[in-house]
């Protein structure tokens, strides 16, 4: 059994500058899991792919609360089954890639380290079929949705919800891979493309009604049991995503919006989340999806006080989660056995 080494990646120049998570840390950086240990030996592990605007504010928020922080580059993480647990009080999972985000949370939970978000929450949010099933089962309003397990069955699925419709990848973010299909020719083209893709996962068809909106959607940022802020995302394209050039403006956080966002967050397991809502032209308010890797620079709408308030709420939730502890604490079980 090997020990986890002391990886202090990003606790110095790399973290403050935001240019990388291992800057100036020496040869040991990235060798294995580890932490820059604070005075009490129990730092908050801020696990990230890179230090962006949001991570810098989170670092400041944790430190204002007297917490030692170890910034860990998720690209350097490795561990051996049976290793002792890293000396982390709690982990704040800010991994960019969905696959790494899920494995980071699973790793922390296996070691008995409280982590936000949980692997259960990440697994639900990062699979659009799973999340829509969960939201619908919780009684939340969602767009009319159909699923087909192969492209060959996709035409029937789309026929059931009607056109126009939107075909989405099961996994993905930032508005990538969405296809609006207006007629049967477009349907046949998209399904043929899906059939040609190499991965069986890419053959799954996840389709939703095209919800006609005032060319905008709503993002509600949630921290635990608190809806922190809400914004309208308005763009020139039907995909209302900041990564696609949408503009954000303040949205009044009405009791209806707050209730819907908190119910959606609770349904997927809670944590630090971005709940995306659609206002349809016919008066419906629908839960489109819930994001487990929420970015909040856009939600701050250029206002420093709002950005700080979001970071403070996130830090409070993570530290509260640390105080509650994590279920199933203990080392990752080894395959080694005393039995012959």
Which residues fall in each region the model found?
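Phosphate-binding site of ATP-dependent enzymes
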Residues: 179-268
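Protein kinase-like catalytic core scaffold
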Residues: 165, 206, 228-229, 273, ...
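ATP-binding N-terminal substructure of ATP-dependent carboxylate-amine bond-forming enzymes
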Residues: 1-121, 149
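A short beta-strand motif that forms the metal-chelation/ATP-contact edge
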Residues: 89-90, 220-222, 283-298
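Active-site nucleotide/adenylate-binding loops and adjacent lid/helix of ATP-dependent enzymes
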Residues: 2-4, 39-41, 48, 84, ...
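A short, polar/charged loop-to-alpha-helix boundary motif
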Residues: 237-244, 296-305
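A long amphipathic alpha-helix within ATP-dependent nucleotide-binding catalytic cores
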Residues: 239-287, 308-327, 334-340
């Amino acid at each position: 059994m090997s020990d986890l080494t002391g990886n202090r990646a990003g606790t110095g120049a790399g973290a403050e500058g935001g240019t990388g998570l291992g800057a100036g840390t020496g040869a040991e950086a990235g060798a294995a899991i580890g932490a820059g240990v604070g005075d009490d030996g129990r730092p908050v592990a801020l696990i990230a792919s890179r230090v962006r605007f949001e991570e810098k504010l989170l670092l400041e928020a944790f430190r204002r609360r007297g917490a030692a922080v170890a910034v860990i580059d998720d690209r350097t993480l490795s561990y051996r089954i049976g290793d002792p647990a890293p000396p982390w009080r709690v982990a704040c999972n800010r991994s960019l890639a969905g696959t790494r985000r899920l494995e980071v949370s699973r790793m922390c939970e296996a070691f008995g380290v409280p982590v936000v978000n949980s692997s259960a929450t990440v697994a639900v949010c990062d699979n659009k079929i799973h999340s829509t099933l969960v939201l619908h089962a919780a009684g939340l309003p969602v767009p009319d949705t159909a699923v087909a397990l192969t492209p060959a069955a996709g035409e029937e699925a789309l026929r059931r919800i009607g056109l126009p419709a939107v075909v989405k990848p099961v996994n993905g973010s930032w508005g990538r891979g969405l296809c609006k299909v207006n007629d049967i020719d477009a349907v046949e083209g998209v399904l043929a493309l899906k059939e040609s893709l190499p991965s069986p996962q890419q053959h799954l068809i996840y389709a939703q009604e095209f919800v006609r909106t005032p060319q905008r959607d709503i993002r509600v940022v949630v921290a635990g049991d608190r809806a922190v802020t809400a914004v309208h995302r308005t763009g020139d394209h039907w995909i209302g995503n900041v990564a696609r050039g949408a503009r954000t403006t303040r949205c009044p956080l009405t009791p209806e919006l707050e209730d819907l966002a908190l119910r959606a967050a609770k349904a997927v397991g809670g944590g630090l989340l971005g709940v995306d809502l659609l206002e349809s032209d016919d008066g419906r308010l629908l839960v489109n999806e819930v994001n487990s890797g929420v970015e909040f620079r856009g939600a701050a709408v250029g206002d420093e006080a709002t950005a700080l308030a979001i970071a403070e709420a996130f830090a409070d939730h993570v530290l509260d989660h640390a105080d509650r502890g994590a279920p199933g604490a203990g080392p990752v079980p080894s395959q080694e056995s005393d039995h012959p």
